[in-house]
Amino acid sequence: MLTCRWCAETYDETDSLDCNDTGFWCDICDGFTFYHPSEQTKHRLLLLLEQKGSGSAPQQVIPSVQKLRKRLSPLRYPGGKSKLIDYLYTKLSAENLETFVEVFAGGASLGLSLLDAGIIQCLVLNDKDPGVYALWKTILESPQELLTRLHGAAPTHQDLAEAKAVLSSGSASMSDLAWSFLLANRLSYSGIVKANPLGGKNGSEEALLSRWNPKRLETNILHIHSMKNKIALYNMDACDFLTEFGYWHRNSTCFIDPPYYLQGPKLYNCFFTEADHRELAECIQSLYREFPEADMILTYDDHPCIRELYPLAQQEFVQRHYSLRT
C-alpha cells in the first residue's frame, strides 16, 4: 500500500502511477512521495524567521566549526547575512553542498564565504536588480574597469548624485551601472541606495568617505575575480530563475533571501509587493511538493503573513539585532 504524504490518498500495487526509482506522484494533488521516508530529509524546505532581539536578550551561541571569512563582499546591505554566516553554516546539509545557489544574491556574503573556504564547488548567483547584476558581472569579467576608477580621485557628493541618476536612468553601460551601484552602496546610509549620503546631503567629505576603502575594495574584487571559474551569474526574476535553472542542481542548496516583508520597499530598488511575496511562496512550495531536488533554505523577517504563506516549510526562529548604521 502506498500513501501520498501530502493528501493521504492511498494506492495499491495495481494502480497505475507516474513514478521513478525513488518515489511516485499522486494523481490527486500532484505531490511527490518517496518510497523511503529517509530520502525526504535530503530535500528540505527550511524557513528561518528573523526576530528582532532586545539589547538584554541572551545572544545565541554559534558553534565555531569552520573558519569562514565574512567580509569578502564589496557591498553593504541592510539585512545582509554576514553576521549570520556562522549560524547559517550550521543549517546546511553536508551532502547538498556541491553547488550553492543564491536566488537573491545581493552582497552574496554567505556564498562567497563558502566558496572561499572550499566548502562548495560551485556558486550560482542571481539578482534581478540591474545595478547588482552589473557589479557582479564586471567583477567576474572585467574588474580592471572598476579598479581604474578606484585608483582615481576620491568620490564627492556630486559623484554620488550622478551615480544615483545613472541607476535611475536604466540606459547606462554595464561598466557605468557597476561603478554607480558600488558608489551608491558604499556612500549611502546603511548601504541603502535610496538613502541620504553618509553624513547628510551637506555633510563633510570625511563623513561621506567613512565607508570608502579603495584598498580593501580592490583586494575583495580581485579575490572574487580569482574564483570566477567557479561562479555562474544570472539576471532573472526569482521564480523564473528557480524553475528554469536554480532548483535543478543535484546535491545542491538553494539559499533564498527575499526582500524584507515589512521594510523592503524602503530599502531596495527591486522590492516585493504583497503579490510578489505570495507568488514566490507558491513557486517555492510547488517545487518542494512536486519535484524534490535541491535543499532550500529561506530567510525572512518574522511576520504572521510570512508564516501563513509557508505551511509546508519547517519553520525556525533566529534572534537578530537589527541596526541601520553608517
Language model: regions and residue ranges:
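SAM-dependent nucleic-acid methyltransferase catalytic core
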Residues: G55-K91, L140-F255, P259-P265, E279-E282, ...
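Residues immediately within or flanking Cys/His clusters that coordinate Zn2+
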Residues: M1-C4, G23
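Short, cysteine/histidine-rich loop/knuckle motifs that typically chelate Zn2+
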Residues: W6, I28
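Long, positively charged, glycine-interspersed low-complexity recognition regions
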Residues: Y261, F271-T326
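SAM cofactor-binding core of SAM-dependent methyltransferases
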Residues: E98-L167
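Short metal-binding segments enriched for Cys and/or His
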Residues: C29-L47
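Cys/His-rich microdomains that often coordinate metals
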Residues: Y11-D12, T33
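Short linker/helix segments within small regulatory modules
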Residues: D15-G23
